[in-house]
Amino acid sequence: MQVLNFIIKNILTQASVVVGLIALLGLVLQKKPIGTVVSGTMKTILGFLVLSAGSSVIQGSLAIFGDLFNKAFGLKGLVASIEGINGQSMTDLGLGSEIAITLAGIFIVNIILARITPFKYIFLTGQALLWESTLCVVFAYFCGLRGLPLIIVGSIVGGAFATLMPAFAQPVMRQITGSDDIALGHFCTFGYMFTALIAKLTGDKSKSTEDVALPKSLEFLQDTYLSVMVVMVPFYLIVAIFAGPKACAEYAGATNYIVFMFLQALQFVTGLYVLMAGVRLLLAELVPAFQGISMKLVPNSKPALDCPVLFPYAPNAVILGFIFTTIGSIIGMFLTPMLGLPMILPGVMSNFFAGGTAGIFANQVGGRRGTIIGCIAHGIFIMILPALLSPMLGQIGFQNMTCTDVDTVVTGFFFMIIKSIAGIF
């Protein structure tokens, strides 16, 4: 058991190590020379770590922006945080071991299902699997399951989600990437496909966000990072002005608050640059290495990777998705109390990563107009679903808490429906 716990806590929860081991296995199965195996494995890990470093820079900048945004406009409500649910389930309920073992079980079930079903997707986003494991264990626990039955049920449900969600998104993914080499491993798939549906109904895919014609004086905006900067700097400065110097001083210290927020906007752009460099390095090594697994262990399988791998395909759509998902989430924030549900505060980080990815999906099937309309709808959607789950979590002891990723929310709904059908309620 100690060995298993060590593997789970130190390997399976370290996404860079998992991805590196997958690359190692793939290269070994292809009988590549030792130098190629070492190089490919290390570059895969390095690519993932560079991606993660960029993501961390973005998250740090957005955390400041999000806190000051709420203070600037006096917003109060629930903050959706699956991290909080994970922490309480381990400290108050003592479910840490069950969550860890279920995480390993989900990965095993995913591989088995990929082997025996037509859905050949290996889910490689370790952090997302941890959150799915948390929700599966928590809701299985409150359905009355304990010990081994809890772990088995949680593993099967989580493994099914890890297999089916990439399959659900793959028709649009093929259009976005122009190939069938990679899949999406991010538990916001219901939101992405909902956005794509709205975009397809309301948009025109022939007018892409990436084909905007600019006058010569604005041609510099064709540089992805400069165009992001032009959008984000005003966002940050407006929030700084409304929040005021006192609120900003907590983060800015002795630096002028306007200058500080200007630099934070540039920090965001820097993080995006690093993230995209990591994506390119990761895909250049992982996709060829994964062919070994595809050929030997799970024939025709595809790696399901985290959402930032899509950002280079439509960078303008990422920014539009972020902006209009944020607008939609603000609308949703005021709409939920009108529906008798708790008010959920918009999460800036989820708006960027999930909203940006939703923008790519929307643009692919609905162009610019579809991206705008679809992402506003997406913002409302990702406010309403967590608000619906919050009372259910309250019933089982998680007061004033809810989740962010909509697929984990759907997992909660699934368990509660099964509980009702079984008559345990």
Model regions: which residues?
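Membrane-interfacial helix-loop connectors
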Residues: Q127-C143, L286, T325-A387
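Mid-membrane cores of alpha-helical transmembrane segments in multi-pass membrane proteins
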Residues: F73-E83, I101-F107, Q127-L135, G154-G159, ...
